[in-house]
């Protein structure tokens, strides 16, 4: 009840008090891990999730939690070691499939990333996160019919998705497919989310390819003034 009322600190306090370290109850341990993850307290989440993995190895949530913690620790390889050996048990579990696909993507294993994110999307067809990452994978692997289809779907289902507009624009300009459409998409992205360094950089790159060099320089300079560390701009 306290968790539902967003009184997470008191919920944790009560659960810790009733938790018996010598006889851990599954529901209490799972709830504690969930609360610590919600608080982004990954240290304590790990402590209780280790109990979950050790005492309840058949419970799926322990491996999923471990993968979440690993990804937040910038360790996709570790996340893969938790999920891959058990993935046959999670064939209908969106979270497990999505996390495994995301881990492979962060590890630059695009083939496996595509496989598991595609499975995740079959389980949960409305997953925008899966669509975004799959679109980037298709783009990087030259499967542009698939990437274009996903970008258009993302835009159609949410006209405020600046990332979809920008990534579609960048994809188009990189392959010089349709610069006018790329410009239209990029302008919309920048209208939705002004002062975004990567979005301004995309717009400048499009104007460069359209040989409108003054405009190109203007937007690249704006982008650089916001984020001078972007290696693409530098």
Predicted feature locations:
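Register position in tetratricopeptide repeats
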Residues: 4, 38, 72-73, 106, ...
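Residue-level recognition of tetratricopeptide repeat
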Residues: 1, 34, 68, 102, ...
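Helix-start (N-cap) detector for alpha-helical repeat units in TPR-like alpha-solenoids
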Residues: 25-27, 59-61, 94-95, 128-129, ...
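Structural marker of alpha-solenoid helical repeat scaffolds
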Residues: 21-22, 54-56, 88-90, 123-124, ...
């Amino acid at each position: 009840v306290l968790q539902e009322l967003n009184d997470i600190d008191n919920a944790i306090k009560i659960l810790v008090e009733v938790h018996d370290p010598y006889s851990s109850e599954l529901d209490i341990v799972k709830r504690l891990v969930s609360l610590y993850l919600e608080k982004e307290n990954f240290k304590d989440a790990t402590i209780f999730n280790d109990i979950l993995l050790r005492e309840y190895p058949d419970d799926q949530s322990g491996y999923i939690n471990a993968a979440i913690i690993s990804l937040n620790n910038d360790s996709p390889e570790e996340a893969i070691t938790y999920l891959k050996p058990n993935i046959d048990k999670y064939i209908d579990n969106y979270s497990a499939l999505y996390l495994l696909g995301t881990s492979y993507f962060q590890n630059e294993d695009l083939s496996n990333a595509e496989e598991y994110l595609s499975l995740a999307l079959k389980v949960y067809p409305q997953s925008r996160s899966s669509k975004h990452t799959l679109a980037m994978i298709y783009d990087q692997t030259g499967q542009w019919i698939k990437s274009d289809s996903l970008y258009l779907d993302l835009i159609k289902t949410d006209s405020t998705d600046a990332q979809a507009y920008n990534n579609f624009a960048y994809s188009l300009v990189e392959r010089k497919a349709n610069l006018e459409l790329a410009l239209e998409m990029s302008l919309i992205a920048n209208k939705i989310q002004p002062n975004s360094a990567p979005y301004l950089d995309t717009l400048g790159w499009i104007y460069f390819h359209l040989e409108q060099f003054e405009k190109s320089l203007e937007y690249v300079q704006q982008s650089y003034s916001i984020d001078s560390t972007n290696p693409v701009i530098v």
